[in-house]
Amino acid sequence: YLNFICDIYEVPSKMRKQNFEKLASAFQMGPHLNNLISSYSHGMKQKLALIAAFSHTPKLLILDEPFVGLDPEAFVILKEQMKELCASGNSVLFSSHILDVVEKVCNKVSVIKHGQLLYSGRTTEIVGTKGLEEVFMEMNGDEISVTPTKE
């Protein structure tokens, strides 16, 4: 599968090998790459898809809910890989409902509700002194209420 993806993007053999080793090691998939994909758990399939996505160093990487199904280590590795890709002059566009991650990873954010664009701009401008979750709840007209449980 990974070779097929790299063939599509004409990734040279040497670069392909380096990328596979680096990414498979980072996502702890090295020992599993020769196994049938059908034997993978959901999280392993997600990691494989991410390795494929990063393996050709795209100028623009578009991901839909990339953190779903990942274990905590892979979660951290994905954030690092996204930052690394951006630091090399490329861009990552991803959707997520995990606003804490969006706030920490993104320098720009767009907030969409029911197909309507509520905000698009720098993360620091929308967040200010509040967290992105709080700002989002305010945009929704909802209030964050923390009620203590009886436990």
Regions found by a protein language model. Give the residues of each.
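ABC ATPase "signature
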Residues: 120-121
